[in-house]
Every structure is written in structure tokens, then in C-alpha cells.
């Protein structure tokens, strides 16, 4: 992206943007006239005192399409969701950007208009906009009024699968396809599935689905969480992530921060020094750059 992306960010979103960039491992500085400047190897994100936000770098377009627009600029509430009463299936994941903890994929099947009306009555929205207590409360409502399935890939299993696929998008496609196949009615009829487009090409998920027995049609789009069924799936996936990371903390007597920030790296070094590399690999995603940085910088 040769031309910088420029927009004005509402003051209410400044903290959210900074928190999410910290989770992603961006490095922060504060040049003159700025609130902050955050950098990754491929993206520079500068927020000025005026509220002007400037994004540039070779990875800027992907950053904007798959993070900034869907998670920061286009936040929404359930009141703004179009009340589409067509039976459908939504699928979403949680934990793919977190160094510690599992990858969780959830699907929600709203089989009729009554199910959808019940979902619309709740305060369901994209899980990224909710705190943990809200997630846990809404998850109970979703499970009570819909058909659902959740896949939890603990770090040990996740690392095994990543070694098989050698690519996160291929792993995500397999997991999403598996959930869709489990929930899709036979025959699918008018029912369709909606998934966030996590890969640059829609063919990645479609190829994974061809290996399954379902004939359901799938819509992939950026900001799929704006659909209430996908938003419901995102909540169940996040609930599973919260519960599972708590179990891992209790099992290994460690604190596992969310995201991929400097706090995460510090916690990883502590685990490596006190419990060893084997235990560290049981609580984290070992293909992350953070894993190698921790292991290379710590004397065992």
C-alpha cells in the first residue's frame, strides 16, 4: 500500500486501538504531536493528538481489511444488525492471535425464524466488543436457544495440527469446515453458512469443505460478525477460550496473559525458567515468533 490510509478516530476508540495493538505485539513510541505510534515489521500506525490516524507500510491493506475496519472503525451493536430471519449457520474462532491458550472454533445453527428472533432479543454482538463477564452470560442464552458445536484445540493438539498443515489458514479452514459439516442439515436445502473470510482467497475454506459430506453453500466475507449468528458463534468460541485458558492456568500454576504483548513474552520467560520448555510448549502456540524469542533470550 503506497498511499497512507488516513482517518479520524473517535476519542472513545483510542484506548481500544492501543489495547488491541499491544495484544498484537506492536512496539510503541510517542513522537511529537502524537498520542502514540505503534509499529510491527510491516505496519506503522500513528495516532495524532488531533485524532488523525495514519496507517502505512507493506502490510497496511491487510491490517485495514482484516483488523482496523472490522474490529475498530466499524464497531456495532445488535440494534444495528439487520434482522434477517433466514435459517443459517454461523462459524467463528477465538484465540488465533493469542500466544497462550487454545484455538477455539464455534458454530451456531439458527434453524428457524423463532430461533433468530430469540437471538435478536439479546445483546449479542461481536465478542471482541464484550468483556469476559458479558461473554459468559450471553453464552448461556445462546446455548439455550440454538443448536451449536464447539471445537477446542488445546496448545498440544494445536501445535500437532500446525506441524501437519504448516499454515494457519489451512488449519482454520479444516476446523471451520469440520464445524460446518457437524451442524449442517442433510440435505441443506435453503440453509446456508456464513464465515469470516480469514484467508485472502475464498478457495481455502471451499477446498476444505469439499472433503466433507455436506452440500451447504457458504458465504465468506470480511466483518461477518455483523451477522447475528456469526456474532453468536464468536461468543461461544470466546467463552471456550476463557474457560480453557483458566484450566491451563490452574493445571500448571501459571498466569497466561491474553494476546501477544510484552507482558506475554515476560510470562513466557518466567514459565521457561521455572518449568522448562516442555511445559511452555503445552500452554502456547509454538509457531509464534514469540516462542523463539523467549527460548533464544533465556538461559536454561
From Swiss-Prot:
Asked if Nuclease is a keyword of the record, the answer is: yes
Which domain of life, per UniProt? Bacteria
Q: Which UniProt keywords apply?
A: Cytoplasm, Endonuclease, Hydrolase, Magnesium, Metal-binding, Nuclease
Under Enzyme Commission nomenclature, its number is 3.1.26.4
Q: Where in or outside the cell is it found?
A: Cytoplasm
Tell me its cofactors.
Mn(2+); Mg(2+)
Give Gene Ontology CC terms.
Answer: cytoplasm; ribonuclease H2 complex
Q: Which Gene3D superfamilies match?
A: Ribonuclease H-like superfamily/Ribonuclease H, TATA-Binding Protein
Q: Which residues form the RNase H type-2 domain?
A: 86-300
| One Pfam family cited in the UniProt record for this chain | DUF3378
Q: What class of enzyme is it?
A: hydrolase
How is the cofactor bound here? Manganese or magnesium. Binds 1 divalent metal ion per monomer in the absence of substrate. May bind a second metal ion after substrate binding.
**GO BP terms:** DNA replication, removal of RNA primer; mismatch repair
Residue stretches in coiled coil: none
Give GO MF terms, alphabetically. magnesium ion binding; RNA binding; RNA-DNA hybrid ribonuclease activity
Keyword Metal-binding on entry: yes
Indicate the family of this protein: Belongs to the RNase HII family. RnhC subfamily.
The function of this protein is: Endonuclease that specifically degrades the RNA of RNA-DNA hybrids.
What name has this protein been given in UniProt?
Ribonuclease HIII
Q: Which organism is it from?
A: Chlamydia abortus (strain DSM 27085 / S26/3)
Gene name in the database record: rnhC
Amino acid at each position: 500500500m503506497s498511499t497512507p490510509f488516513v482517518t479520524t478516530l473517535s476519542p472513545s476508540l483510542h484506548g481500544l486501538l492501543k489495547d488491541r495493538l499491544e495484544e498484537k505485539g506492536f512496539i510503541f513510541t510517542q513522537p511529537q504531536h502524537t498520542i502514540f505510534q505503534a509499529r510491527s515489521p510491516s505496519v506503522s500506525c500513528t495516532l495524532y493528538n488531533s485524532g488523525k490516524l495514519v496507517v502505512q507500510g507493506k502490510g497496511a491493506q491487510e491490517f485495514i481489511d482484516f483488523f482496523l475496519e472490522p474490529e475498530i472503525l466499524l464497531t456495532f451493536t445488535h440494534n444495528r444488525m439487520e434482522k434477517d430471519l433466514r435459517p443459517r449457520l454461523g462459524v467463528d474462532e477465538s484465540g488465533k492471535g493469542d500466544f497462550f491458550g487454545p484455538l477455539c472454533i464455534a458454530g451456531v445453527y439458527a434453524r428457524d425464524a423463532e430461533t433468530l428472533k430469540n437471538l435478536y432479543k439479546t445483546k449479542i454482538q461481536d465478542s471482541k466488543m464484550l468483556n469476559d463477564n458479558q461473554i459468559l452470560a450471553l453464552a448461556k442464552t445462546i446455548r439455550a436457544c440454538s443448536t451449536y458445536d464447539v471445537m477446542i484445540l488445546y496448545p498440544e493438539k494445536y501445535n500437532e495440527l500446525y506441524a501437519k498443515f504448516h499454515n494457519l489458514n489451512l488449519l482454520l479452514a479444516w476446523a471451520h469446515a469440520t464445524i460446518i459439516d457437524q451442524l449442517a442439515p442433510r440435505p441443506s436445502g435453503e440453509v446456508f453458512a456464513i464465515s469470516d473470510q480469514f484467508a485472502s482467497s475464498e478457495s481455502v475454506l471451499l477446498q476444505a469443505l469439499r472433503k466433507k459430506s455436506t452440500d451447504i453453500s457458504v458465504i465468506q466475507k470480511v466483518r461477518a460478525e455483523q451477522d447475528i449468528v456469526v456474532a453468536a458463534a464468536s461468543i461461544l468460541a470466546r467463552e471456550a477460550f476463557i474457560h480453557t485458558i483458566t484450566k491451563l492456568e490452574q493445571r500448571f500454576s501459571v498466569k497466561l496473559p491474553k494476546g501477544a504483548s510484552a507482558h506475554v513474552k515476560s510470562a513466557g520467560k518466567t514459565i521457561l525458567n521455572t518449568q522448562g520448555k516442555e511445559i511452555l510448549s503445552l500452554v502456547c502456540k509454538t509457531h509464534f515468533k514469540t516462542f523463539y524469542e523467549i527460548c533464544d533470550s533465556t538461559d536454561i
